[in-house]
Amino acid sequence: DLHIPPPDNKINWPQLSGGGGGSPKTGYDININAQQK
């Protein structure tokens, strides 16, 4: 929770990560990669 961006992004992360693993950033990165492919 220490590398969380501004509150606005923090609200969207859980939805983008779909519960991703470990940290919101990890789930967010994985989701972005999936969308690009």
Curated annotation (Swiss-Prot):
Residues 1-37 are annotated as: Disordered. GO terms for cellular component: extracellular region. It is found in: Secreted. GO terms for biological process: defense response to Gram-negative bacterium; innate immune response. Keywords: Antibiotic, Antimicrobial, Immunity, Innate immunity, Secreted. Induction: By injury to the body wall of the larva. Expression peaks at 10 hours post-injury and is maintained at this level for at least 3 days. Its main location: secreted. Synthesized by the fat body and secreted into the hemolymph. Acute phase protein with antibacterial activity against the Gram-negative bacteria E.coli (MIC=6.25 ug/ml) and S.sonnei (MIC=12.5 ug/ml). Lacks antibacterial activity against the Gram-negative bacteria P.vulgaris, P.rettgeri and P.aeruginosa, and against the Gram-positive bacteria B.subtilis, S.aureus, M.luteus, B.megaterium, C.bovis and E.cloacae. Belongs to the attacin/sarcotoxin-2 family. On the 2D-gel the determined MW is: 8 kDa. This is Diptericin.
